Each structure stands twice: as structure tokens, then as C-alpha cells.
Swiss-Prot record:
The gene is HN. Gene3D superfamilies: 1.20.5.110, 2.120.10.10. The chain crosses the membrane at residues 28-48. It is found in: Virion membrane; Host cell membrane. Residues 1-27 are intravirion. GO terms for molecular function: exo-alpha-sialidase activity; host cell surface receptor binding. This is Hemagglutinin-neuraminidase. It comes from Human parainfluenza 4a virus (strain Toshiba). It catalyses: Hydrolysis of alpha-(2->3)-, alpha-(2->6)-, alpha-(2->8)- glycosidic linkages of terminal sialic acid residues in oligosaccharides, glycoproteins, glycolipids, colominic acid and synthetic substrates.
Length: 573
């Protein structure tokens, strides 16, 4: 039975295969016949109407051209709509959102003023500091668009009330200013040495919180709403400040030894985050991010202000790495060096590379690899231990130094002090990936600026730019007034302002300037010739009701009758 059933299956399969073969042959024959009929018909038509063929071709071509034109028009229209949607989402929506927020703040402030005037009572909403409404939406912007042959100049320095207290004894020393201008208020801090600037053992810290208000003649003044004098025995140094909602945060390092001893000693010196909030008592906490005491011999804030970015609190850092640590091994041997257009170095490429590599390891700091970094904390949990240190690659950044972070129109920029062989201000654009709990650096772009050189020493003066190991310079941050050009080759593609010390070897001749990447537009020396000066920081803002731009320059000045160093303010418009 099994054999009979198997034979039947084979026979059925054979019959099925034959049927499929005949169907295929029939289909092929039919297709050939149809093609033949079409070809014969086409020949007959062409032979019978030879005179109309060219007309038919022209008509077809015309219709095809019209079809292509319609398609091109439709495509352009769709592309225009797509671009408009992109522009609305990425540009207009944030602007409108900011305008709505500004309007709400303005209405709240006006409401509070009316209540105080009409009822004679205090307005609880007034507990939160708010700038005068004429300045709202005038902060952290690019105020110009670069145009060839256009120069930026300020007309005059303004007389206005000073908001920074000065030294009160002949040997008092006030140094290291840090200033942060937020959307609702500003924060300021500086260090005070009672026994002169050379005293490393003890110091106090001043912090103030205030708002921008308007004088009767229309110019701004910096009104101090709250201030605090920290005199608790802790020797705070290198404090960076940032304005946060309803308060200020400062990142400081507490020192028990001088700077060179800190880089030599393996005993970790803690960083402290100080909360100065108008609603709550002063709080302090130790910052101890994962691996910090293992990877770093010493780490300090960058002095310049930090920033708020997408609910993250970010401070500049720099310090010395522990030899053979994970970060040290990752960064060792990496280097970055730009070539100066103005101060050309005649060294060979190999000599430049060797000098650049050597520049990261500083003999003065016990041979430590000196690294820049960023402290990142969740603003919503800044009273916890929840912080992390981000390490920028030295493939794209020069040797670690003091610095400042800017958030300008949602772009992060980082100023790095010229502490090594490069004499000019270093400015980088930083891009972050925010997809995880803490961000990761995805891009670092250097902007080559060749104005405002820092004073140096005989090994690395302010008028030379060959890569080599040295330690020198001074903190002189630079403020971009238009979007900095990070493309190569670098051209005159942005405007800047600040103070610099116009001396290649000594901290003398503080000079105010406006400039582009390569040339000054305006320079004005402060005070007498060879005046001693030091750190400087610059912040600009616009009075939106008058469209007038103001820039605040905060600078350390020596040679004072009272105090070794004072902090002096200038306001230009």
C-alpha cells in the first residue's frame, strides 16, 4: 500500500509540473505576440504621419517641461514650509516663550509696586529679586552681527554708584572678583585678606545679591538687595559664583597650604559649594564627586562665573592629576596648539609638537599634569552629593587654567586663562549631550583670537607664541559681543570687549578695548602709565526699552592709598 500511494504522488507531481510548463509557454507566446502587434502598429503610424511626428515630440516635450516646472515649484514650496516650521520651532518658539516669561515677571513686579503704593503694605512677591523691567530680556545675548568694515566703539564711561566695598586699612587686600548676571538678579563675590595679598593663611569672603535698577537720568545702577560677610575661619580661595533662582551659589576651595604645596601634597583639599539664598539660611556642603580624591592631587574652581544650563549647574575647574590615575593615563600625551598669525613661531612642526606636549606638565607644580574640567551638579539637588566632573580632551584644549563659562543664547562658551605659552585669550564653544543623567562633551571648538595678550615672563612673554612649558599669565576674561567664529581658517568674524594689561612682562597698564579677532577698534588706558593691575572680568547687558548697550568691567587695581589691591568698576555705554 505504501508503494502504490507513493507512485500516485509522483504521478500527480509530474502532471502538475507539465501543466505549469504549458501555462508559462502560453504566457510567453502571448507576450511576444502583443509586442509584435505594438511594433507593427508603431511602424504603420510613423509611415502614415511622418509630418506630424516632430509636432508630437514638441508637444510631449512642452508638457514634460511644464510638468517639471510644476514639480520644481511644488518642491520649493514644500521646502519653504519645512524651513519655516524648523525656524518656528528652533528660533521663534524659544523667543516667544522667553517673551511670555518676561511679561509675567514684569506684570508681577508692576502689581507689587501698585500694592505698595496704594495700600502702603509690603508685597510678599517682592521677596524674589527682580531687575527693573527695562532690562528684562537684555541679558546673555549676542548684541551684534558681524559686518565687514563695521567697528564697535563705546562713547563714554559712566558715573554710577559703586556696589563693591573697598579695603579699609593700608595693607588690606581685596582680590579675585567673580560676577554672574542672571535674568532676575546678579551675584558677586570677592576674597579679602586682612594682612596683605601675600598672606596665604587666612581670608574672608564677601558675597552680595542685587538687581539692576534705573537712575533718574536713565542710566543703570547695581542695587545691593542682600549681602553677607563670611568670617568663619575658613580660608576660602578661587571662588566662582553663579546666579540661581532666588539666590547665589559659590564654589570655593578651602586652603590650608599655599598653592605649590597643594600640588605637591597628596592630601586632598575639599571643594565646598556655598548656598546663599534669600529664602533660606546660608548652607555649605562638601563636593566630593566620584573618583575626585583618587584622580586629582588638587582641584580648584576657575574663579570666573559658572552657568545654568538645562537645569544643570556648571562651574569651571582646574587642577593637577594624580600620576597613573585613569584620567592622567587618558590625557597624557595629548596636545593642542594653534598657530599665531601675528606672532609666528619659527620652530619646526616636530619642535612645536614636543613643546605643546611638554606644556601640560608643569615643573612649578611638582611635575603634575594640569587639567581643565567642569563641575556639573543637578540644580534641583544641589544640597546633595550628586555632582560629577566632566573632563575635556586635551586633543582640543590647552593646558588647564582658571576660566569662565558663558551661556549666551543657549550656546556654551568657555574662556581659559593664558597661563602657558599661548599669550592670547582662549575661547572654546562646548557642546553637550544631555540624553543621560549627566551630560557628556560631544564637541569642543577653539576660536583663535589674537588681541589682548596677557603679560608673561622671560620664558613666555606676551609677544611670543612658541609652544613650551611655562607658567605665567593673568585672568582677563573676554566677552563676545557677536557669535564667535570657530571655523578654520579664522577670519575677522566676531566682536569682543574687555580689559587687558598692555605690558609683555609685567601686570601693568590696564587697558579697556573693543576689537574683532585680529584688530582693536578702541583702546583706552586706565589711570597713570605703568599702573599695577590684575584680574578682570567683563559682562554686558542691554536696556531693552532704549536699545542701549552697557558693559561692566570689574578689575583689580594696585598702587592704592588704602589697600595693596582694590577692585574697581567701570561702566561703559
Amino acid at each position: 500500500m505504501q508503494d502504490s500511494h507513493g507512485n500516485t504522488q509522483i504521478l500527480n507531481q509530474a502532471n502538475s509540473m507539465v501543466k505549469r510548463t504549458w501555462r508559462l509557454l502560453f504566457r510567453i507566446a502571448t507576450l511576444i505576440l502583443l509586442v509584435s502587434i505594438f511594433v507593427l502598429s508603431l511602424i504603420i503610424v510613423l509611415q502614415s504621419t511622418p509630418g506630424n511626428l516632430q509636432n508630437d515630440i514638441n508637444i510631449i516635450r512642452k508638457e514634460l517641461n511644464e510638468l517639471m516646472e510644476n514639480f520644481e515649484t511644488t518642491s520649493k514650496s514644500l521646502l519653504s514650509v519645512s524651513n519655516q516650521i524648523t525656524y518656528d520651532v528652533s528660533v521663534l518658539t524659544p523667543i516667544r516663550q522667553e517673551a511670555i516669561e518676561t511679561n509675567i515677571i514684569s506684570k508681577i513686579k508692576d502689581h507689587c509696586k501698585d500694592r505698595v503704593i496704594k495700600e502702603g503694605s509690603t508685597c510678599t512677591l517682592n521677596r524674589s529679586p527682580l531687575h527693573d523691567v527695562s532690562f528684562l530680556n537684555g541679558f546673555n545675548k549676542f548684541y551684534f552681527t558681524y559686518k565687514d568694515n563695521m567697528q564697535i566703539k563705546f562713547k563714554s564711561l559712566l558715573d554710577y554708584p559703586n556696589f563693591i566695598p573697598t579695603a579699609t586699612t593700608p595693607h588690606g587686600c581685596i582680590r579675585i572678583p567673580s560676577f554672574s548676571l542672571g535674568q532676575t538678579h546678579w551675584c558677586y563675590t570677592h576674597n579679602i585678606n586682612l594682612l596683605g595679598c601675600a598672606d596665604p593663611a587666612s581670608s574672608n569672603q564677601y558675597v552680595s545679591l542685587g538687581t539692576l535698577q534705573v537712575l533718574k537720568m536713565g542710566d543703570p545702577y547695581f542695587k545691593v538687595e542682600h549681602s553677607h560677610y563670611l568670617n568663619d575661619g575658613r580660608n576660602r580661595k578661587s571662588c566662582s559664583v553663579v546666579a540661581v533662582p532666588d539666590g547665589c551659589l559659590r564654589n570655593c576651595v578651602t586652603m590650608t597650604k599655599n598653592e605649590t604645596e597643594n600640588f605637591k601634597d597628596l592630601n586632598w583639599q575639599h571643594n565646598y559649594l556655598h548656598t546663599y539664598h534669600i529664602m533660606v539660611p546660608l548652607k555649605t556642603r562638601i563636593i566630593n564627586p566620584p573618583g575626585s580624591s583618587r584622580d586629582w592631587v588638587h582641584i580648584a574652581p576657575g574663579v570666573g562665573s559658572g552657568l545654568l544650563y538645562a537645569k544643570l549647574l556648571i562651574f569651571p575647574l582646574y587642577g593637577g592629576l594624580t600620576e597613573k590615575s585613569v584620567i592622567h593615563n587618558n590625557q597624557s600625551g595629548k596636545y593642542f596648539f594653534p598657530n599665531s598669525t601675528k606672532l609666528q613661531c619659527r620652530n619646526s612642526t616636530m619642535e612645536k609638537i614636543k613643546g605643546a606636549k611638554d606644556s601640560y606638565t608643569i615643573t612649578y607644580f611638582s611635575g603634575r599634569l594640569i587639567q581643565s574640567a567642569f563641575l556639573v551638579c543637578d540644580l534641583r539637588q544641589f544640597l546633595s552629593e550628586d555632582c560629577e566632573i566632566l573632563i575635556p580632551s586635551n586633543d582640543y584644549m590647552m593646558v588647564g587654567a582658571e576660566g569662565r563659562l558663558y551661556n549666551i543664547e543657549n550656546n556654551i562658551f568657555y574662556y581659559q586663562r593664558g597661563s602657558s605659552w599661548w599669550p592670547y585669550p582662549s575661547l572654546y564653544r562646548i557642546r553637550l549631550n544631555l540624553s543621560k543623567k549627566y551630560p557628556r562633551i560631544t564637541e569642543i571648538k577653539f576660536t583663535k583670537i589674537e588681541i589682548a595678550p596677557r603679560p608673561g615672563n622671560k620664558d613666555c612673554p606676551g609677544n611670543k607664541a612658541c609652544p613650551k612649558e611655562c607658567i605665567t599669565g593673568v585672568y582677563q576674561d573676554i566677552l563676545p559681543l557677536s557669535y564667535p567664529n570657530t571655523a578654520f581658517p579664522h577670519l575677522k568674524q566676531a566682536y569682543y570687549t574687555g580689559f587687558y594689561l598692555n605690558n609683555s612682562l609685567e601686570r601693568r597698564n590696564p587697558t579697556f578695548y573693543t576689537a574683532d579677532n585680529l584688530d582693536y577698534h578702541q583702546q583706552e588706558r586706565l589711570g597713570k602709565f605703568n599702573l599695577t593691575a590684575g584680574y578682570s572680568t567683563t559682562t554686558c547687558f542691554k536696556q531693552t526699552t532704549t536699545a542701549r548697550l552697557y558693559c561692566l568691567y570689574i578689575i583689580e587695581v594696585g598702587d592704592s592709598v588704602i589697600g595693596d589691591f582694590q577692585i574697581t568698576l567701570f561702566l561703559a555705554a
